């Protein structure tokens, strides 16, 4: 047995592979090891010196001592030097070899196959058939690459690539599709000239059929446009037969490739089955229509704005419909400032003798003719009216308000007597005894022909 046999592997008849650089060469005739020895001398002189017992060439640095004469290699012929240069791979070849090793390692790792599969004669024959110049890595190199894949999170990703874009970035949003759906996706890609039929046949052979979510809506619309149909799904049955001929043919060609891969019997889908597959695919991947928000309208939205409501009136039809639908409720009691009060009932409307200036004229206002006067313990008077519907009280219109006033000079502790007001007149009586600091006059708050609006007022004394 040759001394250098430990540096080589016999991969097939008439060929050997160097364990150091993975170089593959032809063996010598009749079991001669001359090609292996020649390769070791030229490319691995140190390893060859270990088994041969000779000293490898050494390089010394210039020192103060006289220079020593280095051993000179024997002169080689020109043809041998040229052959030696051809044996050394270039940088581009090394990059290609590393990429091949990486792909083989990924294939073995994802399929759960052992690393020594690279020594299998059938596996080597397949790779040699695809590329006669391929440099097949050894099992040790594959194991090293597998370890690096396990440490690298990007290389260790088992995310299957998309059959449309080939995206295999970890964590990209994708969906797993069936064989029929994948064939329809690829059919749409072929019909829109984004893939050739050969590329579609190759993509259907993926182990896991996944599609990125961002392709779903795009190819759904593309299939609509290709078939010449509108956005409604109901008219797919009304399309002519010639609209499905091209897609039907491409669909069967792509699906046959998948059936061949899975060792299934080759079955072609007829036109009715293709239409059923297509309709189900378009329905399952149809985008959902977003629900628009519907704002609820309230009573306050139906009424006018309250910014300048003094000269506005409530619509007649609106309140007529509102009053017919709602029952009469009890009036809301006016919230008193003090809990202790004395009730005093007066059948006359409550007005102040100094609530208007001398030049003001009485105007018709919708105040009720009869009001209940409440006299508090501290001398304040509160007037309130009978019931109004809660919808009117909460409709955004002013129902209860307060009039602030002040007088010049001292005021008596007892309130002034209120003069009587005729029943047919519902306005303020002007009086020149006391000036008015502020007066609020609200006209036409309600239509008197519709309802006798009854409002409550609160005044400070």
UniProtKB/Swiss-Prot annotation:
Residues noted as binding Zn(2+) in the record, renumbered to the chain: 18, 21, 39, 44
Domain of life where this protein originates: Eukaryota
InterPro entries per UniProt: Znf_BED
UniProt KW keywords: Metal-binding, Zinc, Zinc-finger
Presence of keyword Metal-binding: yes
Positions of BED-type zinc fingers: 1-51
Keyword Zinc: yes
Protein name: Uncharacterized protein ZK673.4
């Amino acid at each position: 047995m040759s001394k250098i046999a430990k540096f080589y592997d016999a991969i097939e008849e008439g060929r050997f592979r160097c364990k150091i650089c993975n170089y593959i060469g032809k063996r010598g005739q009749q079991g001669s090891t001359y090609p292996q020895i020649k390769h070791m001398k030229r490319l691995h002189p140190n390893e060859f010196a270990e088994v041969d017992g000779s000293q490898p060439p050494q390089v010394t640095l210039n020192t103060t001592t006289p220079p020593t004469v280095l051993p000179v290699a024997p002169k080689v012929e020109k043809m041998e030097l040229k052959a030696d240069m051809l044996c050394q791979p270039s940088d581009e070849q090394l990059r290609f070899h590393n990429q091949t090793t990486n792909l083989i390692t990924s294939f073995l790792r994802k399929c759960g196959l052992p690393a020594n599969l690279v020594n299998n004669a059938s596996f080597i024959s397949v790779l040699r058939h695809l590329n006669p110049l391929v440099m097949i890595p050894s099992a040790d190199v594959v194991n090293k690459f597998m370890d690096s894949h396990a440490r690298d999170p990007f290389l260790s990703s088992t995310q299957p690539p998309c059959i449309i874009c080939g995206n295999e970035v970890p964590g990209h949003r994708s969906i797993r599709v069936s064989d029929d759906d994948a064939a329809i996706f690829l059919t749409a890609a072929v019909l829109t000239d984004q893939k050739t039929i050969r590329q579609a046949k190759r993509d259907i052979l993926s182990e896991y059929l996944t599609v990125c979510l961002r392709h779903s809506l795009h190819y759904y619309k593309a299939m609509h446009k290709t078939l010449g149909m509108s956005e409604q799904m109901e008219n797919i049955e009304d399309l002519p037969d010639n609209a499905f001929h091209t897609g039907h043919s491409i669909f069967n060609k792509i699906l046959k490739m998948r059936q061949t891969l899975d060792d299934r019997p080759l079955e072609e889908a007829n036109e009715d089955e293709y239409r059923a597959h297509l309709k189900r695919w378009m329905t399952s991947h149809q985008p959902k229509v977003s629900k628009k928000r519907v704002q609820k309208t309230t009573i306050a939205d139906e009424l006018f704005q309250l910014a300048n409501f003094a000269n506005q009136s409530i619509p007649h039809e609106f309140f007529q419909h509102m009053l017919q639908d709602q029952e009469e409720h009890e009036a809301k009691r006016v919230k008193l400032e003090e809990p202790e009060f004395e009730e005093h009932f007066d059948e006359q409307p409550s007005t102040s003798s100094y609530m208007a200036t001398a030049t003001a004229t009485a105007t018709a206002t919708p105040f009720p003719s009869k009001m209940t006067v409440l006299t508090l313990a501290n001398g304040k008077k509160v007037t309130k009216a009978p019931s109004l519907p809660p919808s009117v009280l909460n409709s955004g219109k002013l129902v209860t308000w307060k009039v602030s006033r002040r007088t010049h000079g001292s005021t008596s502790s007892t309130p002034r007597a209120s003069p009587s007001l005729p029943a047919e007149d519902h306005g303020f009586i002007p009086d020149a005894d006391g000036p008015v600091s502020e007066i609020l006059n609200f006209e036409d708050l309600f239509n008197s022909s519709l309802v006798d609006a009854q409002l409550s007022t609160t005044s400070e004394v």
